Amino acid sequence: MSSQNSFMSSKKDDKGKNIQVVVRCRPFNQLERKASSHSVLECESQRKEVCVRTGEVNDKLGKKTYTFDMVFGPAAKQIDVYRSVVCPILDEVIMGYNCTIFAYGQTGTGKTFTMEGERSSDEEFTWEQDPLAGIIPRTLHQIFEKLSEIGTEFSVKVSLLEIYNEELFDLLSPSPDVGERLQMFDDPRNKRGVIIKGLEEISVHNKDEVYQILERGAAKRKTASTLMNAYSSRSHSVFSVTIHMKETTIDGEELVKIGKLNLVDLAGSENIGRSGAVDKRAREAGNINQSLLTLGRVITALVERAPHIPYRESKLTRILQDSLGGRTKTSIIATVSPASINLEETMSTLDYASRAKNIMNKPEVNQKLTKKALIKEYTEEIERLKRELATAREKNGVYLSNENYEQLQGKVLSQEEMITEYSEKIAAMEEEIKRIGELFADNKKELEECTTILQCKEKELEATQNNLQESKEQLAQEAFVVSAMETTEKKLHGTANKLLSTVRETTRDVSGLHEKLDRKRAVEQHNSQVHENFAEQINRRFSVIQQTVDEYSVKQQGMLDFYTNSIDDLLGASSSALSATATAVAKSFASVQETVSKQVSHSVEEILKQETLSSQAKDDLQKLMTAHRTGLEQALRTDLLPVVTAVLDLNSHLSHCLQSFLGVADKIDSHKEDMNSFFTEHSRSLHKLRLDSSSALSSIQSEYESLKEEIATAQSTHSEGVNNLISSLQNQLNLLAMETRQQFSGFLSKGGKLQESVGCLQQDLDLVSSDAIECISSHHSKFTEQSQAVTVEIRQLAGSNMSTLEESSKQCEKLTNSINTICQESQQWCESAGQKMDSLLEEQVCYLHSSKKQIQTLHKDVEDGCGSSVVEITDRVNVQCQAQEKALTSLVEQVKDDKEMLGEQRLELNEQVQSGLNKVHVYLKEELRNDVPTGTTPQRRDYVYPSLLIKTKPRDVLLEQFRQQQQEYLESICSVISEAVEPPVEQDSLEDEPPVAVNDSVISEKSCIDLSMTCQEKGGVPFFQQKKALRKEKENRGNATLLERSKIMDEVEQSLPKSKLPLRMQN
């Protein structure tokens, strides 16, 4: 394909060259701005495109794009147009080519400005330097510069022709009368060229003369003011520049090279309604538009390669004949307006320019003339002019008046035009005849070929008819077999419908079962998913509770450590205070000792006197004390020690129970996922157990409180008795009082420990029971057996705890009874000892009265000496009490805070347990999905369907039946035909139409064959369609007769010779 394109392009280059088309758009003028017109043109100089917006302003789709050789926008300058368009053409003119540049477009778009230009208003520029100068002055200026640079001999001749109202005028004529019309003739040397008789050619020697010539021609040219342009050109102008250049060959021969440049400024097309032209201006506009319309038709004919080009319809096109499709290099400058009010004229101009781009010229270099040939031509021209001059002087030739001469010349011109037109028509007719002859020969060959093909086709038709006859017989047999198969097929179709209905029912039932299984599967999947989620949540919840319990145990351990440290600090402070008090007391006793030592010596004598009396009393009192001690020891050993051991055993047993409860709690934690059914019963039983335990412990606490009160009363009574005894027996009874106080403090400490152990036991029981209740209430298990086992174990532990509490209460009762007996015995002993001591006291009264004064004086001295020390000790004790009170207050506050924190922790655990219970309820009541019956599951039933299929008879049996039916139908039809025979036809009618009778016999013979075939075909028709088949046979028989007659007529027509008329006559 590429080689073919290259070949075509090379062939195109050999044939010629397209006309160069340039588009120039001028800026907006004042009239367009006043009319508020917008721009409809977009000039792309780089892409050489002009885009016209044919729709509204915002319509992006209504655009049309044209592509040209060059495009100049409104900002383009005169020098830019000249350098791009004219400079290359000027070089070709100097090379010897004929070139043409003409401006085309609407009036007022800048054609004259482009070709001629204007003079600047300040007149400080020369023609060649003026930025407003057009193509014509710049071209002549550059011609002289280039020819001067080359250095050859040259001559330049210019002419300026005006075409006004289809008349030719010479604008450079020396006569002042511009109205002299010029005549135009065909150039005999150039078939496409013209000669204008009387056109003045002026030789130009320098550029200054050129500018004078241009000014003179512009002054004579027809211009007028219209609404479109104040200086509108009313005529076409053709400025021709002919250059003769001298060349010398290698051999020394002198040649003359001729180049010609035509610069054409066309008058603009205009809308008379818009331009406001009337009368004379309207006629001018009509002639201008007529010539431009002819130019457009010439361009269209050249583009479409029409056989006739209407050059002679206008003088403008006759002058431009060689430039349009001839041997001249042509460039067209199309000037347009960007305003929307001139859109129609702009589109028309661009369409003409786009079509003109396709015109093909064949530029040729002008033949170079030798000096001798040119001199010979000039000599012949001089001789011809001399003869015409001599004839005019001598009046020997033919003399005609001007009117006759002009009339004769007009006839000659019209005849020449007619001859030209007729010659063109003759040439066209000859080409048409030649084309028709070739077409006739081709048709004749095709006819011969068709005849041979027709003969072959007739032979093939005969063979095909024979084959058709055989095929009909086979078709009849096959039709009978097919009809039998159709009946079998219908029966099978009914059976298949029954089977399909059964299959549909079974399929519907199976789909219902599958839907039931899908629903079951969906419920199971949902429950398994919910179960997994519930297990994960419960594990997560118990791990959180376990973590919380660990944190709380750590916090409680911290609280215990804090309490221990606080008590240790308090004990340390107390010990330090006691040590300080002891030192102060020692100092006071040291000061008192001095005073007492003075009286001791005096008292020794008196004590020695009383020693004898006290010794006897001492012995009696020692006897009583030993007896009382042994009694107390025996009572303590026999009564209190077993109770204490029993209480200790009870404490260990309760600790063991606590450990067992902890083990049970661990078991409950291990089986927390298996408890489900007996949640309420376990909660109630544990709650009852906790109440019983708390009531028992409260009873123990009350008994302990009563025991403590009794011990306190006993201690107070004993202390009173001891104080009474001390007053009489100071030194002897101090030891007894100390021992008794130690014993009672031991009892109280043991009782406090017992209370602490019982309180801890109660707290532990409360914690264990509450933990058990919370754990059991927050976790429902599915395995009831393990829950029952745990319940039995808890009940056993509860029973053991109850028995332990009963034993503890019994031991406490025993302890109370023993303590009461001891107190009674002590009271009796005290009474007996008091009676004995009364006697002794009476004896000592006298001595005491005597010693009283001494002791009082000593007492005063001791009081005076110990007053200061007592005050000091009191102050220290007060300070120590205040410090201990502060410490105890802070400890009490800390205990309250810890108690509140424990309450908050308990509430938090209760909330977590309650949330776990809620999740369990949600799991059991909401998340678990039940399989709800829908009522669409199919029931079991029996299906009824046919089990046997019908089979068609064998082919041999069917064919035998077909032959029998065919024989029967043939016999019946032959009998019907014999009965329906028509009467004999008259001889005259037979003699009148002999060929038709022959044809009828042939037709009847063929119809009999067709009838037999139809009978055979009818044999295969089912019995319920045989009547319809008979009616169709009659219709087919008539159709067959008509078809045979038409075939015979066609054969007769083919046998007759046909007249072969030429195609021209038929047309």
UniProtKB/Swiss-Prot annotation:
Residues 18-359 form the Kinesin motor domain. Residues 365-480, 692-721, 882-915 form a coiled coil. GO terms for cellular component: cytoplasm; mitotic spindle; nucleus; spindle microtubule; spindle pole. Pfam families: Kinesin (PF00225), Microtub_bind (PF13931). Highly expressed in unfertilized eggs, especially in the germinal vesicle and in the radial yolk-poor channels. Also present in testis. Phosphorylation of Thr-937 during mitosis controls the association of this protein with the spindle apparatus. A subset of this protein primarily localized at the spindle pole is phosphorylated by NEK6 during mitosis. GO terms for molecular function: ATP binding; microtubule binding; microtubule motor activity; plus-end-directed microtubule motor activity. The modification Phosphoserine is found at residue 1046. One of its GO terms (biological process) is spindle elongation. The modification Phosphothreonine is found at residue 937. ATP binds at residues 105-112. Keywords: ATP-binding, Cell cycle, Cell division, Coiled coil, Cytoplasm, Cytoskeleton, Microtubule, Mitosis, Motor protein, Nucleotide-binding, Phosphoprotein. Signal peptide: none annotated. Belongs to the TRAFAC class myosin-kinesin ATPase superfamily. Kinesin family. BimC subfamily. Plus end-directed motor protein required for establishing a bipolar spindle. Associates with both interphase and spindle microtubules. May be involved in nuclear divisions taking place during the development of unfertilized eggs. Required in non-mitotic cells for transport of secretory proteins from the Golgi complex to the cell surface. This is Kinesin-like protein KIF11-A.
